[in-house]
Amino acid sequence: FFSSDTGNTWTSANNGLTSSTIYSFLINNSDIFVGTSADGLFLSTNNGASWNAQNTGLASSFVHSLAVSGSNLFAGSNYKGMYRSTNNGNSWSQINNGLTSTFINSILATTNELFVGTVNGLFMSADTGNTWVQSDSGITNKFIIAVAKLGSHLIAASYLNEVYLSVNNGSTWNLLNNGLPTGGSSSLVISGSNIFLGTYQNGVFLSADTGNTWNAVNNG
């Protein structure tokens, strides 16, 4: 769906899409990419007016996460691992060397590294995805649903409402759960110095102190 009035009204923008379940979005300059659950990746070059499949080289039809770093695009799939494109999605190459889990939930592209959250741990690459090393020391629940950058720190969220902070680029992690209920996490977003955690049963929680304390923000 597309809105041109800050979300007040929405219109369908599905021309060319053959799958209606969208799991990921990526905007790269004027191009929009969406990852679907059944038919892979689609690209729009006209603000969503039409879409074309961009699946050459992709062995998975379920694209769960997307990221961009410089001239490289990255796609995380379910059970087929990571893919990289160097030509704006025209073709893709699998880049799983070192990944022991190939169900990719999330991708974070920083200036020099890539981080991916999987159903069995967090992995880091310092060479645009050519090789991966596990980077989740201190994380007990390794079903990582999201990883994000907060200033010079990294924040990771696991499925069971566990949020972790790393101050050394992912080498070690500390649990920051004060105020969070038990249950499942669905999403993590950073806005300035604020961290927002979406949950399955308990709404949205906010931390304004680098994850040290959390409060529900569900008014409305």
Language-model-derived ranges and their functions:
Residues 1-11, 15, 128, 201-202, ...:
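Thr-biased low-complexity repeat/linker tracts and other Thr-enriched repetitive architectures
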Residues 3-4, 44-45, 85-86, 125-126, ...:
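Conserved Ser/Thr-centered positions that define the repeating blades of beta-propeller domains
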Residues 10-13, 51-54, 91-95, 132-135, ...:
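A structural motif specific to WD40 beta-propellers
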Residues 14-20, 55-61, 74, 96-102, ...:
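Short loop/turn motifs that recur once per blade in beta-propeller domains
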Residues 22, 29, 63, 104, ...:
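Conserved positions at the start
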Residues 31-34, 72-75, 113-116, 153-156, ...:
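Entry beta-strands of beta-propeller and related beta-repeat scaffolds
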Residues 39-41, 80-82, 120-123, 160-163, ...:
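Loop/turn residues immediately N-terminal
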